[in-house]
């Protein structure tokens, strides 16, 4: 779905480029129209995509980058959105997942709970804790 919508929006970006519109306007178009389609609920579905589907979405980003646009890779967009989501969950005491995010004694990194099954390891909480800790550590 995101691939199809992204391709449709790329058409309009090509039209803007062919009309020799300033690059700043094309960048703004990419950020507001195409990137917003690609980022819609990316924290939920991006990690579950097959390599083939990720390749299709990355093709849209590559095509946009060839049009002299400043683009952010899908992996970076996913990481950024997951970290933002974790920060929102930590800040909201009423959030159902708030109890899963506990800081270590240092107060900087999050504790990773014990994971007995692969099924749990592949869920949002453990992956988001790892991403958050990696972002804080670097």
Question: Where are the regions that the model predicts?
Answer:
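Hydrophobic/basic alpha-helical segments
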Residues: 1-138
